[in-house]
């Protein structure tokens, strides 16, 4: 997972990409429907704590606040379901899938628990080698991650070539680099293959 329509970017994935030595070959958009799970016989009024992965919590945050329940971040959604089945406490609930409810013999206390129904997560499929594709093929996105120091006009100098060569940037995000606050890392998605003529000129600039 790389980003979600409600919770935004998945920071852990973005941090891992530059050092992974893997190539992005496809993207996949998956509609996410969260469920509020509890042990058999539990009711929402019994719940005091709701556990899930940080993305699950973020995507259901308004619902949790409205219920006035404590949020507890766990390693993943399925693991949260497993944990509450082991705790066997009516005061603990989890945000997870219907499949997790079936596997761990839990009740679904509320279906579609996410804050909005339009909840979509974008996934990247990655592998060691690039696909053999004609560089001039349309409908190709390329992802670029780069690091710059915080100096005047540095971002313009990095990205100006995209404008002058007609390459459309579809996504641009910045986040602090581990080296410190004077270094920024940028995550960029743009249209075109790295070997496309216009893209090559943009990258050379």
Across the structure, where does each feature detected by a protein language model lie?
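Domain-level signature for soluble enzymes in the chorismate/prephenate branch of the shikimate pathway
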Residues: 2-205
